[in-house]
Amino acid sequence: MSYGGGGYGGRNGGGYGGGRDGGYSNGHGSHGGGYGGGGGGGYGGGGGGYGGGGGGGFGGGGDRMSNLGAGLQKQDWDINALPKFEKHFYKEHPDVTNRSQAEVDKFRREHSMAVQGSDVPKPVETFDEAGFPRYVMDEVKAQGFPAPTAIQSQGWPMALSGRDVVGIAETGSGKTLTYCLPAIVHINAQPLLAPGDGPIVLILAPTRELAVQIQAEISKFGKSSRIRNTCVYGGVPKGPQIRDLSRGVEVCIATPGRLIDMLESGKTNLRRVTYLVLDEADRMLDMGFEPQIRKIIGQIRPDRQTLMWSATWPKEVRNMAADFLQDFIQVNIGSLDLSANHRITQIVEVVSESEKRDRMIRHMEKVMDGKDSKNKILIFVGTKRVADEITRFLRQDGWPALSIHGDKQQNERDWVLDQFKTGKSPIMVATDVASRGIDVRNITHVLNYDYPNNSEDYIHRIGRTGRAGAKGTAITFFTTENSKQARDLLGVLQEAKQEIDPRLAEMARYGGGGGGGRYGGYRGRGGRHHGGGGRGANDLPMGGNRRW
């Protein structure tokens, strides 16, 4: 969706689409309306949905094909022959200049901030100190933010200085604005796009959900500058994305596979890219995108400015930074060791597989106490089938639950996310694919129905709550089949000074047993109540005994 014209669903009007009475109906259900149903250009209907795009699963199932990019020509860059571009915009505010090194060190300590590299600029403590032009500041102040977050305080001066930057910070730390606002300044300093030009700013993201959220921020803050953008990702038709690219966009937010598809078919080029962002770099590598990322970066001039953002700093991410960034400066917020957000209360219960559903209902009754409850709970399960089974079970028991996973169509996923965000359906069941990149405010509880494959995924899952300074609660069911993960989990809990279930400590001490398997040994049995799974769990009418 390029900025300009039309309702929320694209250039061609259409707005939000569909009636609001029924559940998701995909345009053919019996609930009257549905979400974007009828094809008249609703949220995802018609051409020009929320960002368009086709092929690939949840974040690009098709994005993982290693032969993607085989048709791209290797570029032989002559730096001296390339047009010059401007990337140095930072002018230190007098208040920042006058701050002593001792004051700077104190500020960094208070915000758990560490920096590395040569000539790292001092952090800013207010929006005005960042020195953004008025057209940017007006948009920021209109949002009512009290002060920059820690990553913004240090990241803005770094990005505006034109340097290559690495930022390591937990999800929900405000990193999107850390690179989006300098991107807007960067664009406005470059020559206007000519016909046939590709984007000036390229942002690579691992999943379509994260890409759409980044697009929303760029649209919001780039509005006054009339900056055009598009989202390029798999799972939806290519037509709207191709139209946006052919009309010209200053910003392209993309998942790697679909972007390579567009490059190979000549629908865009990266010759004008001078500001490159790799968001959630660790997640992109986890998902196997490194070959595609390397092919894409090979199409971009080497004197570009590159910013890499990651929640963790493993060897693979360090290697990528060394390969693609030059003389970079780095900011870390919090510990580089694997650790959970300390604002999250972590409750781990050692249970048998057959106990899970009853335990879940018990927690739901506490969390969702009364219709006036403002709580939102995100439930993680190990497989798509179990996601549907649990959703059916909850709906039949009177709970307003919806599920999201890779087999859902894009417009259904958008609808589910909207219902969850607005609180109309405050319970969402998700597979791991939703654990990163979905930015839903005010999730108060995360419930790990199935324990994930490793402690990194555990930390990313529970990081959906306790964001932006809020507190949260994470409830986790842990079985003997997960015992190989017990020692790592115990370390995470101890680091965050959480209460330890004695049975978990015993498992960690003796280790062994069970385990293996993609999801810590979980076999997808779904406990003793088999809800039948299958398609259409989100369509199922809620049981007569409404629990919320």
UniProtKB/Swiss-Prot annotation:
It holds the Pfam family DEAD. Residues 156-331 form the Helicase ATP-binding domain. Gene3D superfamilies: P-loop containing nucleotide triphosphate hydrolases. One of its GO terms (molecular function) is ATP hydrolysis activity. GO terms for biological process: nuclear-transcribed mRNA catabolic process, nonsense-mediated decay; rRNA processing. Transmembrane segments: none annotated. InterPro entries: DEAD/DEAH_box_helicase_dom (IPR011545), Helicase_ATP-bd (IPR014001), Helicase_C-like (IPR001650), P-loop_NTPase (IPR027417), RNA-helicase_DEAD-box_CS (IPR000629), RNA_helicase_DEAD_Q_motif (IPR014014). This is ATP-dependent RNA helicase DBP2. It comes from Pyricularia oryzae (strain 70-15 / ATCC MYA-4617 / FGSC 8958) (Rice blast fungus). The gene is DBP2.
